[in-house]
Swiss-Prot record:
The organism's taxonomic lineage, starting at the top: Eukaryota, Metazoa, Chordata, Craniata, Vertebrata
SMART domains per UniProt: KRAB (SM00349), ZnF_C2H2 (SM00355)
Biased composition (Basic and acidic residues): 112-126
Gene name as annotated: ZNF785
Name of this chain's protein: Zinc finger protein 785
Zinc finger (C2H2-type): 172-194, 200-222, 228-250, 256-278, 284-306, 312-334, 340-362
Gene3D superfamilies in UniProt: 6.10.140.140, Classic Zinc Finger
A Pfam family reported for this protein in Swiss-Prot or TrEMBL: zf-C2H2
A Gene Ontology BP annotation from the UniProt entry: regulation of transcription by RNA polymerase II
Family: Belongs to the krueppel C2H2-type zinc-finger protein family.
Main location: nucleus
């Protein structure tokens, strides 16, 4: 048997006593002593899944009090919990009119009033501390209600319940996939994946959803609300997940790596598109000529050949072009831009093809004579000299080489 518990220090009048539960007597335990309450503001901050989990925990806690032998009447709070109402109700508030930290206060109203007010203000600023305060209060309350029947954990008939409660091992298994859940509400929500049930409908467009949180996210489309702003650029998003993905553009995070070339990407769809280079996959086919393409953008550009679409007009002369590259090349006619200079003589050209044709003038006479001899009296393709064939107009006018004799 373990060592006896040290006695609590006696309360001195005028001083704040040690934090204990509401009642110092072990037998005077009510559901309000171990329940957690939320204010209307705190309740609004909870997501639907968190509210469902909270209801399950409160129902379970109320049932455990009865299993421990405490005669506890069913409070109105439990009736509100069992109704699974999403809106906050006065039945959900602390029956003593205090915050959820009321179960952890000292003896004496006058001595502990200052600490109680400070505690309530602290919990208002940080509602998550309710969970910590609740755990501390249960640990302080549990030895006071323990009797010799439950003191020895090996002989205690409630030991299995304690083990399951403390470790949260209350599995509810899905009969379809075998996945386990801690609470029946989570299991019921999961089973809609298998059944296809969509009990939550949008009142404006009649779209249906399997979970309430999906409906709430969808309703942002109708309201136009975007409650999640980016702290870096101020752009707003409807969903928290979309904001997290967007922030990768600022952080430079690239969590998706290609297994073939180790390239990294910010988004998974970019990785999937990139991997087509390695696999050779071309999932998009042209309905007119059956050519296949790896990307939808290439297919859209190719289809302009069949449709005759020319979406790029020249702002100077109005001539239209099928591709933006052709428009860019054409606009050099209206400007003095000559971005392709010859490295031999410095002459500039507006097109790269014109530069390549010009550079044949600077070839040695032996190279040009060899090409001229090769094409005389032959019908075969012209041999490649220096990695490239002569320009087309050179083939039709071989007298251009007469300057070399």
């Amino acid at each position: 048997m373990g060592p006896p518990l040290a006695p609590r220090p006696a309360h001195v009048p005028g001083e704040a006593g040690p934090r204990r539960t509401r009642e110092s007597r072990p037998g005077a335990v009510s559901f309000a002593d171990v329940a957690v309450y939320f204010s209307p503001e705190e309740w609004e901050c909870l997501r639907p899944a968190q509210r469902a989990l909270y209801r399950d925990v409160m129902r379970e806690t109320f049932g455990h009090l009865g299993a421990l032998g405490f005669s506890v009447p069913k409070p109105a709070f439990i009736s509100w919990v069992e109704g699974e109402v999403e809106a906050w109700s006065p039945e959900a508030q602390d029956p003593d009119g205090e915050s959820s930290a009321a179960f952890s206060r000292g003896q004496g109203q006058e001595a502990g009033s200052r600490d109680g007010n400070e505690e309530k203000e602290r919990l208002k600023k940080c509602p998550k501390q309710k969970e910590v305060a609740h755990e501390v209060a249960v640990k302080e309350w549990w030895p006071s209600v323990a009797c010799p029947e439950f003191c020895n954990p090996r002989q205690s008939p409630m030991n299995p319940w304690l083990k399951d409660t403390l470790t949260r091992r209350l599995p509810h298994s899905c009969p379809d996939c075998g996945r386990n859940f801690s609470y029946p509400s989570l299991l019921a929500s999961h089973q809609r994946v298998h059944s296809g049930e969509r009990p939550f409908s949008c009142g404006q467009c009649q779209a249906r959803f399997s979970q309430r949180r999906y409906l709430l996210q969808h309703q942002f489309i109708h309201t136009g609300e975007k409650p999640y702003p980016c702290p870096d650029c101020g752009r707003r998003f409807r969903q928290r997940g979309s904001l997290a993905i967007h922030r990768r553009a600022h952080t430079g995070e690239k969590p998706y790596a290609c297994s073939d070339c180790k390239s990294r990407f910010t988004y998974p769809y970019l990785l999937a598109i990139h991997q087509r280079k390695h696999t050779g996959e071309k999932p998009y086919s042209c309905p007119d000529c059956s050519l296949r393409f790896a990307y939808t953008s290439l297919l859209a550009i190719h289809r302009r050949i069949h449709t005759g679409e020319k979406p790029y007009p020249c702002p100077d002369c109005g001539r239209r072009f099928t591709y933006s590259s052709l428009l860019l090349s054409h606009r050099r006619i209206h400007s003095d831009s000559r971005p392709f200079p010859c490295v031999e003589c410095g002459k500039g050209f507006k097109r790269k093809t014109a530069l390549e044709a010009h550079r044949w003038i600077h070839r040695s006479c032996s190279e040009r004579r060899a090409w001229q001899q090769a094409v005389v009296g032959r019908s075969e393709p012209i041999p490649v000299l220096g990695g490239k064939d002569p320009p087309v107009h050179f083939r039709h006018f071989p007298d251009i080489f007469q300057e070399c004799g």
